[in-house]
Amino acid sequence: MQIFADENMPLVQQFFADLGDVTLFNGRNVTASQLQQADILLVRSVTQVNADLLALNTKLRFVGTATIGTDHIDQHYLAQRNIPFSSAPGCNAQSVTEYVLNSLWCLAQKYQWDLSKKTLGIVGVGNIGSRLARALQALNIKVLLCDPWLAEQQPGFEHTAFSQLCQQADIISFHTPLTSTGRWPTRHLLNADTVAQLKPDCAIINAARGAIVDNAALLSDLQAAVQRRAVVLDVWEHEPDIMTALLPYVDIATAHIAGHSIEGKARGTEMLYQQCCQLLQRPVKQSLDRLLAVPAMEKLQISPNFGLPDVQNLARLLYDVRRDDALLRCYLHSHGFDWLRKNYPPRREFSSLQLSGSLIPTYLPQLGFNLAQ
């Protein structure tokens, strides 16, 4: 069994070694000739899987992407060839949630916001959006939810139309897939017209897909703004050749790494491994818990005085988003966008640290922290 996998998929050799021979490739530059002998193809979002890429392969049995998004996969083509496909929905939901929380706390510190007095609009209430909503609500932050598809599927879902959300929200965070067709296309959902509907100081966070936000329209808005608009961008149009003119106007700029916690990336690998085992009717022998390294900090005893400022400081100790902003600004021109992603420093999720104490804030589990039993 020939297994071809993106070189940036963590633990892929450890998970898949018992299923066949694992060959690693550069996901951005892989060619059809390289994949000619692949029985199993494992990719990330930088690889466009389509007829051109698979033109020379006649033996492919499975395609998997270790990501939540699937807009880089031609699923119609795979279906025509009867090639099973799987993604990893929810694999990095906690990682992205922690990225947004840390970004919000940084913005609150920078601009002296009281987040409890802000209204935060979440566009897209899937695995990530719903998890973020629970975390924010646990912190008593008012949340507006925008997801027209979910509104049709779930009676009682409190949906706020995007146009209404634009007018009411103090902060908007995008968590939708990227779609160009259908009833609710998301490509350039935030464009020149919709950005004009925002409050003058409404903050924008995009940790979903770059083209959800029209980057040129955003730049024009920021350049013309009389009042400072806070912006957090983890994803960009035309990656890896991003619009560098935006950087001076963006508070937190990162290289599409919101979901790049060790757990988030490795969880995607594990999910594809489980799918392959099921497809091949092989027993599941490996698990993420067994393969993950022991974190640098395992346990922390907290006192009854442990409050939200301490939570924020602890979160920054585990992951400081300002580090990734500094890395992008320092190395983008000399090393490039993909280099930043490939050489991303290890980052553990909140759950890697077990908290114990006599009086623990009830909202900590909703943020993702692990409490001692």
Task: Tell me what each language-model feature is.
Residues L60, S116-T119, A192, D201:
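Phosphate-coordination loops involved in phosphoryl transfer and adenosine-cofactor binding
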Residues P10, A138-P155:
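NAD(P)-binding Rossmann-fold cofactor-contacting core
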Residues D6, V43-R44, A66, S173-T176, ...:
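Short, well-ordered coil/turn residues at beta-beta hairpins
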Residues V49, A151-T244:
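Rossmann-like adenosine-cofactor binding region
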Residues D201, A207-L371:
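Rossmann-like dinucleotide-binding domain for NAD(H)/NADP(H)
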Residues E7, P89, T97, S116-Q137:
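Glycine-rich adenosine-cofactor-binding loop
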Residues M1-A38:
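N-terminal glycine-/charge-rich "phosphate-binding" loop or analogous flexible N-terminal tail
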